[in-house]
Amino acid sequence: MIYVYNTLSREKEVFKPITAGKINMYVCGPTVYNYIHIGNARSAIAFDTVRRYFEYRGYEVNYVSNFTDVDDKIINRAQEEGISELEVANKYADAFDEDTLPLNIKPATVRSRATEVIPEIIEFVKDLIDKGYAYESEGDVYFRAKKFKGYGILAHQDLAEMEANAAGRLNDEETIRKEDPIDFAVWKNEPREGVISWSSPWGNGRPGWHIECSVMAQKYLSNTIDIHGGGIDLAFPHHTNEIAQSEARTGQKFVNYWMHNGFVNVNNEKMSKSLGNFTTLHDMLATYDDPMVIRYLLTTTQYRRPINYEASTLEQARLELERIRTAYRNLMFRAETSEPGGDEDVETLIEVQKKAFDQAMDDDFNTPNALAAIFELVSIGNTYTERNTVKVDTVQHLLGTIADLLSVFGIEGLDGNEELTTKQRELLDKRVLARESHDFERSDLLRNQLKEVGIFVEDTPQGQRWHK
């Protein structure tokens, strides 16, 4: 059984999909007004890993995520850059795709944009008004939060406290327009010329942020979905408001399992622009040459826990991943000289660690414990390759198991060929030829040239091995 921590109940619950063997999963994507930061990247990687594990366990996952491509932040950025809101959204949506591609994040089944579902949003708002859950006020439409029973339960927020906090954030105009301080906008009036808007029964305007995700989840999945994911900062108000408006409209439970990933801290401090430690994925990729290390780092902590990012943790992640890659290459190397058959003692050890991996991931996707099982496999492989004789079935079993388990983490290309530059490959090939022709002076020269480009070689009775 797979156990999932449900933010709504604050407990780990046995996962039971609505439809056997299938999972409907919605994950909040970014507001595309800037390059995504490392916290956004963590969320994308965390839920990609969850998705991959479900697929590894045989589930068919319908994975929907969004771009919020109409928002105050996008409007402000468009005015700053002197381009249209659509151009801003397209620029940073494309940047998201380009920056997440090297991290090996699987494409969503559907990647929807808010601007693609405006007619559905308007119909949704109409239904809320008809049911008495929303009201129009000077071109804005607000949701009556207190009318929805259980409002705030996801974030375990006290209604009186929410009301006091909301009142402190309102300006005079909002105070006049709202019936209650905690009411939230599902449609916003937009009277300004040249600012993106759509015609509606309440005048020109645009959707509120929260309603966009409700509409996309219902359109591309169903009224009730298995899993809704996002950063913990979205639990209130975003996901709280999604629940209220979705269930008010349909009368059905919106989400069975709410999953939230923790924050990324930078040098043990909360990431923020005011502290000057705001780190975008775009900048990281421009300065760090191995995206898989970034991905690996962001899976070393269980998804609900905060994770610390700094130069030392990135270097530790690089060393750990290189340890795995080196062991994998050594196994591939020994496979070339292996004998037929298998070694039962090692086969048993492999299955023990595979079971340990599954048990860890079944426990609310406990990636640190799952990685521990992978490193046990690495140790088993390292010990095995030191034997004088190895068996092909066992070597292939080790290779296949390590690759399968790491693919759940999105870590692929373990043979290292994809990591090598053309120059590095050429130097390695030339050195093999030099050794075969007993040209040891040239072999040593090539060893030094390889060292200069970051490749270290060692000679063994079975031939040349290399690592970074």
Curated annotation (Swiss-Prot):
List of residues binding Zn(2+): C28, C213, H238, E242
Pfam family membership, one: DALR_2
Location(s), subcellular: Cytoplasm
Location of the motif 'HIGH' region: 30-40
Gene Ontology molecular function, alphabetical: ATP binding; cysteine-tRNA ligase activity; zinc ion binding
Transmembrane segments: none
Motif ('KMSKS' region): 270-274
Cofactor binding description: Binds 1 zinc ion per subunit.
Main location: cytoplasm
Gene3D superfamilies from the UniProt entry: Cysteine-tRNA ligase, C-terminal anti-codon recognition domain (1.20.120.1910), HUPs (3.40.50.620)
Subunit structure: Monomer.
Protein name: Cysteine--tRNA ligase
Native source organism of the sequence: Leuconostoc mesenteroides subsp. mesenteroides (strain ATCC 8293 / DSM 20343 / BCRC 11652 / CCM 1803 / JCM 6124 / NCDO 523 / NBRC 100496 / NCIMB 8023 / NCTC 12954 / NRRL B-1118 / 37Y)
Lineage of producing organism: Bacteria, Bacillati, Bacillota, Bacilli, Lactobacillales
